[in-house]
Amino acid sequence: MKSLSLILSALAVQVAVAQTPDKAKEQHPKLETYRCTKASGCKKQTNYIVADAGIHGIRQKNGAGCGDWGQKPNATACPDEASCAKNCILSGMDSNAYKNAGITTSGNKLRLQQLINNQLVSPRVYLLEENKKKYEMLHLTGTEFSFDVEMEKLPCGMNGALYLSEMPQDGGKSTSRNSKAGAYYGAGYCDAQCYVTPFINGVGNIKGQGVCCNELDIWEANSRATHIAPHPCSKPGLYGCTGDECGSSGICDKAGCGWNHNRINVTDFYGRGKQYKVDSTRKFTVTSQFVANKQGDLIELHRHYIQDNKVIESAVVNISGPPKINFINDKYCAATGANEYMRLGGTKQMGDAMSRGMVLAMSVWWSEGDFMAWLDQGVAGPCDATEGDPKNIVKVQPNPEVTFSNIRIGEIGSTSSVKAPAYPGPHRL
């Protein structure tokens, strides 16, 4: 759903994946997560958070930059991959640097702030293993994923996102001797939008390739609207595209198969206040169930919420065309016009990437390009054409932020003490 203009504004502070780390100490924020089974409940696990490599501060030795998002690397610094690795320096981030980038943790809570002292930071972070050297690879086909979220400070035009990317577990460090940063410094980002970035797998992107991989948007939302969308690609892992491969009919589904309650004409489901089934001004739990068949193929994506200790099932489709269900499957996607999704293999293709393993990414951002219209304007939500303008966002909320907490992963039906249907809604397997 996201256009290049959207991403350019959101990532202006994130230059790109950098190269050789300097001697500044990296101090990853600790984050407690949980792994759950029906038999034993949820057990705490230690993870760490790393900021995207572009947030670390990327520069040449003379202080000049090494390239901007949407472009090849600086030609002077990066005439070839080896020179790029030598000339482009990445700075480690200590605890104060993380705070100044709008990233703080406490126990199982992760807080992401859009502004620090009125300066745009718009952080994006990834989940590391306890050893901090590799990303935690999540294998979610046939499982359940839950988290708590606080959305009150995200008005129209904001996006607090939690999603999966099929990034390389080591951040691309093993792909080349010129890849120096790795997962430890947040390298190796990719998604289904296939944007050109100065570095690919942590190596100078001399050819100017688009950086593609499978993407599953579990949660893109503000306090007015929510969005779920799987984005499959025809190639496994991180792939450098060229030409038409990078386009809207290329190797990745850029639009995805989306679910937004407003778009299915259930406008009283989610919003600010007690008149909505899910009140976004108070903390709530988001539970996603990735249902597989006996062959292990992903066939459905289910969602329910928990607030005030009560399960709130997703509403059933209330528009003509799609089947009257409350989850995503191939029939729903085909009926809603997700043609690229179906062409690229649909739900099974997304599940194949989830089975191989994907990295958890979390971010907060706004869009100076279209004010996040695709998320919360028109049929997508109640926001008007200008509410999402960053100049207006700060008038409503001077300090936009989101807090994700209590991340729990396990077999279906295991991540909450509140009893919920194994497969929410009228449909049963």
From Swiss-Prot:
Residue ranges crossing the lipid bilayer per the database entry: none
Signal peptide: 1-18
UniProt GO BP: cellulose catabolic process
Residues of this chain annotated as glycosylated in UniProt: N74, N265, N318
Pyrrolidone carboxylic acid carried by residues: Q19
EC supergroup of this enzyme: hydrolase
Keywords: Carbohydrate metabolism, Cellulose degradation, Disulfide bond, Glycoprotein, Glycosidase, Hydrolase, Polysaccharide degradation, Pyrrolidone carboxylic acid, Signal
Reaction equation(s) it catalyzes: Endohydrolysis of (1->4)-beta-D-glucosidic linkages in cellulose, lichenin and cereal beta-D-glucans
EC numbers for this chain: 3.2.1.4
Gene Ontology MF: a single term: cellulase activity
S-S bridge residues: C36-C42, C66-C88, C78-C84, C156-C383, C190-C213, C194-C212, C233-C252, C241-C246, C257-C333
UniProt xrefs under InterPro entries: ConA-like_dom_sf, Glyco_hydro_7, Glyco_hydro_7_sf
Catalytic site: E215, E220
Family to which the UniProt record says this protein belongs: Belongs to the glycosyl hydrolase 7 (cellulase C) family.
Full protein name: Endoglucanase type C
